[in-house]
């Protein structure tokens, strides 16, 4: 019971010297946070927030995060730099990681996940007892026992944490966020505090702006999104009629729009599944947030803890985690079979994040990097066996946040316009580009104005031009807005250097990024984020290669959305835009899997009726002989702005 665990925490905080030697202040601070969580639990249960004002709720919310926001993080034990300075490298990293896990209690309290909370508090008490016993013997804290305690906590509860995460994805009965969206009075902005997410003026202003729009505007925006999802199934030749759930991902503040989207999806026979960005290390994907989320209390903190799993990641744990994943999907296979895939709403406008990669943080060693790659490969295959790639689809759209600046409302209106450009007009223009590209042996992309890009991209041969094409005419379905033609390049012969002065990839702002290729694979890379060359290479390997030693070019595309390009320059937001829009504003290259990953055998066609035959490359073809080598489970686009190009040329294939 959680109450029994809290008694243990109270004992810690009431012990005058904590019996913990140099660790006393750590246990005092973390115990105080745990007791604050008990108060939060009781306040929620007692409906203390029902009559609180917006200002009072804001004050309460800030109190939950006050020790990690702004300058407070510089003295917080959640900061590995602080903990390592106090307790040494091994114990410092461990105690910082544990405090980060304990901060997940905020979510457990709001979602009433008291069993998860109890297990976490019990770990804290176990660590306290280990340190106290060592202090009593006048010995240093026993790192071996401390690490074992954390390892077995994560391992023992991995089945529960993984199963719950999967259920959040596929089980509509887990409707914590859905109930907030559908049951709240969205004109009463106090609803924003019902999540437990960190709330700032940004989320409040976003909700206020959406509330100011007409009902028809909201319906039209929602229809762009939901129709994109529906068209993705139709154009991908996938069975929407078989599906019963859709996973909606959004940022807090967009509830009025999401409510209408839920209604429109339900008219298609789809119930929403909505889960929060993960708060425990076993379910996180580094610092990248997947799910719904509010404001970040501290982006540097999230980056610092991206590899907390390094504490416990070994071969046995990977096998345990894969087994838990397999068992959970098998247990809920009926729900998995009718899940349609994600519908994602991104936001942009915040200042690009430039992280400090501190040596005090956990990092994966070479062996652990290989284990992560192994887990991603095998888990991807497991997921695909239950939520089949040839039967699922997605859609993704982006909107500006108030952080975009004083012209936010103008920018918002402009993005809505860009998201709803004339489908038929672009279809014709893009088809003319495709007609030329289908005759090409390769495409050359060359930079100018200091951009060192010089890429040769090999193009698959079209055998029957009356029935076949190698470029997809991409309109407003899975990727909104419309505006690109793309292909899976032939890897052999694809070579050169790709250079961008600034690019925002996976929440990291890369400066002067250069990537070299030979036969379609990355051979070298560098950026100017740090003076130390190794730190620069590690940043790219961790956040773009995802710890692979290399990746192939899975996609080559030419963006055609000049409207987006003009608007971005007019409002000076080119470097604030998400890759979803930026990729429509110039040629781009995606590192990782092709756009047809795990659905290569499903025939797809352009609006002109021609079959797109470039669904495979030399890597994905290995699925027929060596399936464990066919996929990388990642896909990251890198775009070159028009003004950085001198030309894109397409030498015509000579007839044999």
Name every feature range the model reports, one short phrase each.
Residues 253, 350-352, 401, 450-452, ...:
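Short, glycine-/Ser/Thr-/acidic-enriched flexible segments
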Residues 438, 506-509, 549, 582:
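Short solvent-exposed loop/turn micro-motifs enriched in small/polar/acidic residues
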Residues 9-10, 14-492:
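Active-site bordering "gate/hinge" segments
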Residues 488-547:
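Long, well-ordered mid-to-C-terminal structural blocks that present hydrophobic/aromatic surfaces
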Residues 525-591, 595-596, 600:
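Dual-mode signal for accessory low-complexity, basic/Gly-rich regions
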Residues 356-359, 406-410, 458, 468-470, ...:
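A short secondary-structure junction signal
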Residues 606-649, 653:
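Extended hydrophobic packing segments that form well-structured cores
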Residues 1-13, 646-656:
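Single conserved hydrophobic/aromatic residue that forms the stacking wall/gate
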């Amino acid at each position: 019971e959680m109450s029994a665990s809290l008694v243990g925490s109270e004992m810690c905080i009431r012990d005058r010297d904590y019996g913990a030697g140099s660790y006393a202040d750590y246990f005092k601070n973390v115990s105080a946070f745990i007791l604050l969580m008990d108060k939060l639990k009781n306040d929620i249960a007692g409906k203390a927030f029902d009559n609180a004002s917006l200002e009072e709720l804001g004050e309460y919310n800030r109190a939950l995060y006050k020790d990690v926001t702004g300058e407070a993080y510089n003295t917080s034990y959640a900061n590995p730099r602080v903990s390592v300075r106090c307790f040494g490298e091994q114990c410092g990293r461990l105690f910082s990681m544990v405090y980060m896990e304990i901060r997940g209690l905020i979510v457990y309290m709001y979602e009433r996940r008291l069993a998860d909370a109890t297990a976490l508090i019990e770990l804290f008490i176990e660590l306290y007892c280990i340190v106290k016993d060592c202090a009593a013997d006048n010995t240093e804290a026993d790192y071996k026992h401390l690490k074992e305690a954390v390892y077995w906590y994560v391992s023992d509860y991995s089945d529960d944490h993984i199963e719950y995460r999967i259920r959040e994805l596929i089980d509509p009965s887990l409707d914590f966020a859905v109930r907030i969206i559908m049951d709240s009075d969205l004109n009463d902005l106090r609803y924003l505090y019902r999540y437990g997410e960190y709330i700032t003026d940004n989320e409040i202003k976003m909700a206020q702006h959406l509330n100011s729009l007409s009902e028809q505007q909201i319906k039209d925006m929602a229809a762009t999104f939901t129709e994109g999802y529906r068209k993705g199934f139709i154009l991908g030749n996938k069975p929407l009629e078989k599906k019963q759930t859709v996973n909606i991902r959004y940022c807090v503040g967009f509830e009025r729009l999401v409510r209408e989207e839920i209604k429109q999806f339900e008219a298609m026979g789809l119930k929403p599944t909505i889960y929060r960005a993960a708060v425990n290390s076993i379910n996180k994907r580094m610092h990248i947030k997947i799910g719904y989320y509010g404001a970040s209390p501290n982006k540097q903190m999230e980056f610092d803890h991206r590899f907390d799993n390094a504490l416990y990641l070994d071969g046995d744990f990977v096998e345990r985690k894969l087994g838990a994943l397999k068992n959970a999907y098998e247990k809920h296979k009926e729900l998995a079979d009718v899940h349609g895939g994600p519908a994602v709403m991104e936001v942009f406008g915040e200042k690009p994040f430039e992280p400090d990669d501190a040596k005090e943080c956990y990092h994966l060693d070479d062996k652990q990097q290989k284990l992560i790659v192994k887990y991603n490969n095998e888990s991807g295959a497991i997921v695909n066996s239950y939520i089949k790639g040839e039967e699922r689809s997605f859609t993704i759209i982006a909107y500006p946040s108030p952080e975009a600046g004083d012209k936010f409302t103008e920018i918002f209106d402009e993005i809505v316009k860009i998201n709803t450009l004339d489908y038929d007009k672009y279809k014709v223009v893009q088809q003319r580009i495709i007609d030329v590209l289908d005759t090409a042996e390769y495409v050359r992309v060359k930079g100018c104005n200091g951009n060192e890009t010089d890429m040769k991209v090999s193009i698959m041969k079209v055998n029957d031009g009356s029935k076949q094409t190698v470029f997809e005419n991409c309109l407003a379905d899975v990727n909104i807005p419309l505006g690109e033609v793309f292909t899976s390049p032939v890897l052999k012969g694809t070579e050169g250097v790709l250079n961008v002065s600034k690019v925002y990839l996976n929440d990291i702002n890369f400066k002067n990024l250069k990537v070299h290729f030979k036969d379609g694979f990355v051979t070298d890379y560098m950026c100017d984020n740090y003076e130390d060359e190794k730190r620069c290479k590690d940043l790219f390997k961790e956040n773009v290669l995802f710890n692979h030693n290399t990746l192939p070019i899975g996609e080559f595309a030419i963006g055609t959305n000049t409207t987006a390009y003009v608007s971005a320059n007019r409002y000076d937001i080119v470097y604030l835009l998400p890759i979803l829009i930026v990729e429509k504003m110039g040629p781009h290259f995606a590192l990782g899997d092709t756009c047809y990953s795990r659905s290569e055998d499903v025939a797809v066609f352009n609006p002109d009726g021609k079959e797109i035959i470039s669904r495979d490359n030399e890597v994905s073809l290995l699925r027929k002989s060596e399936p464990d080598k066919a996929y990388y489970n990642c896909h990251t686009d890198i775009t070159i702005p028009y003004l950085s190009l001198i030309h894109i040329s397409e030498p015509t294939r000579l007839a044999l």
